[in-house]
Amino acid sequence: MPRKGPAPKRPLVNDPVYGSQLVTQLVNKVLLKGKKSLAERIVYGALEQARDKTGTDPVITLKRALDNVKPALEVRSRRVGGATYQVPVEVRPDRSTTLALRWLVGYSRQRREKTMIERLANEILDASNGLGASVKRREDTHKMAEANRAFAHYRW
């Protein structure tokens, strides 16, 4: 562990097109091998497609999708007396946003559409309607936490 304590959080710049920190975080999650301009093109293209299909502000659609994907609980491993228990814990708000974005991008990469722009746009639209693999992942996470509720007293 570092002696100086945790590294300070760096401030996130607002996205130049939509003026939203969420879009900046999404761009950073889509980013692969340092190709930021490509990641921006993918995200902006996906948000434009979402706007064309819904007719509403794409940032609002993205926020609705994230609200449907954000987990409230998760399980963490805790070793007690030689046994490892899956202990349900509440998820901090910043971590829930990060997990939601990670799941959105991860499951959009696994989709079958032709381009990444289409995949990301459709995953965002599905998530905003309460459908899609990323929403299912959240439900599975909540089910795991509910199933291991008996170990909640091991929380730290």
From Swiss-Prot:
Keywords: Ribonucleoprotein, Ribosomal protein, RNA-binding, rRNA-binding, tRNA-binding. One of its GO terms (biological process) is ribosomal small subunit assembly. It comes from the Bacteria. InterPro entries: Ribosomal_uS7, Ribosomal_uS7_bac/org-type, Ribosomal_uS7_CS, Ribosomal_uS7_dom, Ribosomal_uS7_dom_sf. Disulfide bonds: none annotated. Pfam families: Ribosomal_S7 (PF00177). Signal peptide: none annotated. GO terms for cellular component: cytosol; cytosolic small ribosomal subunit; peptidoglycan-based cell wall; plasma membrane; ribosome. Part of the 30S ribosomal subunit. Contacts proteins S9 and S11. Belongs to the universal ribosomal protein uS7 family. PANTHER family: RIBOSOMAL PROTEIN S7. One of the primary rRNA binding proteins, it binds directly to 16S rRNA where it nucleates assembly of the head domain of the 30S subunit. Is located at the subunit interface close to the decoding center, probably blocks exit of the E-site tRNA. This is Small ribosomal subunit protein uS7.
